[in-house]
Amino acid sequence: MTTCGETSLLKEEEYVTDAVDHRGISARRSNTGRWRAAWFIIGVEVAERFAYYGIASNLISYLTGPLGQSTAAAAANVNAWSGIATLLPLLGAFVADAFLGRYRTIIVASLIYVLGLAFLTLSAFMIPNSDEGEVTSSSPSSLLNALFFFSLYLVAIGQSGHKPCVQAFGADQFDEKDPQEKSDRSSFFNWWYLSMSAGICLAILVVVYIQQEFSWAFGFGIPCVFMVISLVLFVLGRISYRYSKKRHGDEETNPFTRIARVFFVAFKNPRLSSSELCRVELEANPSQDSPKKLRFLNKSLLVPNDSAEGESACKSKDVEDATALIRLIPVWLTTLAYAIPYAQYLTFFTKQGVTMERTIFPGVKIPPASLQVLIGISIVIFVPIYDRVLVPIARSITKDPCGLTMLRRIGVGMVLSALTMVIAALVESKRLETAKEHGLIDQPQATVPMSIWWLIPQYLLLGLADVHTLVGMQEFFYSQVPTELRSIGLALYLSALGVGSLLSSLLISVIDLATGGDAGNSWFNSNLNKAHLDYFYWLLAVLSAVGFLTFWFISRSYIYRQVDQV
């Protein structure tokens, strides 16, 4: 006979305690979540990344072609847009975690995304000669320019709610309280990135070719169609999803309010004695892993003397959550050393390829932006090797369930990123030397007799760096933030890339100004045969090396949140 206790245990195993299904009742493990739901969401991401990179991967060619911008101005514009597009997810994640929830935020963001892509397609139809590739046409009117950039930033706004929430929603399909599902969640981040890269590869191979060889308007319209497909696919999977339980009550249930209150109360207790603080800590029994440098937050465990009647002290769990967020800041700052070099493949890597020999067969040339597909190919090849071969080997050596800790994985990618910049600098030096040998310094439209395949190593190495650093950052920031703020966690990883792009844009503008612009010996002269991208790559290699050393020093003292370790 089954006892009441056994019945309760069976019920707990059958249902996910922290999630509900689409009807709002407790989610069953057997028919919700896990890989069945995750593959639906991964499919949504594949379609969305196809749409995004259908625009982003060849944007610099559109700016220097139909819009008639200089190389430096176009690179700065691409970096600025890319930076803002990856910073805005902080806002989208805030809206999701504090108000709408992830599912509703994704729906609203997708509609804005589709609208932006539709306007972008319309703007390309209205620009004369917009189907030409690298040939700079007469500058379009201010109105058309305004429509184009309005559409572009509308896409960025749409992505801000879509990007962090879709991945967090996918990871939510695995219950971290179940050992098997917790292990599956770690693999989810690997397969998520592999599938996403497949969508990017498809966009680069298909859309870029159409944009260069046929029509920019048609090339922008295809991503719009794929974004519509993404939205439809997401809605179709709704009955299989697990949704986080929404907490009810007063304003204290808002995670942002609770964490902000920790700082407010701590600062209202500035003169709390050490003995009194120790007493409060012992009574509250906060985590012993809490670093001593952040003990000032524990002052919020005591009600301030001048507090209003009825005001209560903060809970120890809220103090731990606030402490965890602060301790992420140094790690986040050091990842900028990876984000700045990462921004270059959308701009200068592509412009290098424009000047080189691109003939595959007689009469057939490869679009320079198409080489970006090599990043995705290296990811698609290496992720299964990493997940199925290297992780078990590393696990047997390190005794860590994930093989490499998340921070070690990020560090390996940062080293590979620095090496990528070294190789890029050497290849660019060779290209400039070849141009000089053949008397092409003053002939920017001439093809330098050096194959575009010389760029392959830097693209492949960047892909390997991505597998380590970007996937590591996704898992790290998702797992190390409080459970209720996991959309914010993934937005933090994106914001690092966004700030890196903005810093890259600023760095380019400052260096271009300092070295004289197109009229002088600018490192970013529109005539790349007179430019010095090699100097810029060497500078980024040094910055990457310094950033890695700083990251290594900081990561040595980092203590993982025990509840989230895999």
Per-region residue spans from a language model:
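Hydrophobic transmembrane alpha-helices of multi-pass solute transporters/permeases
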Residues: 2-131, 137-566
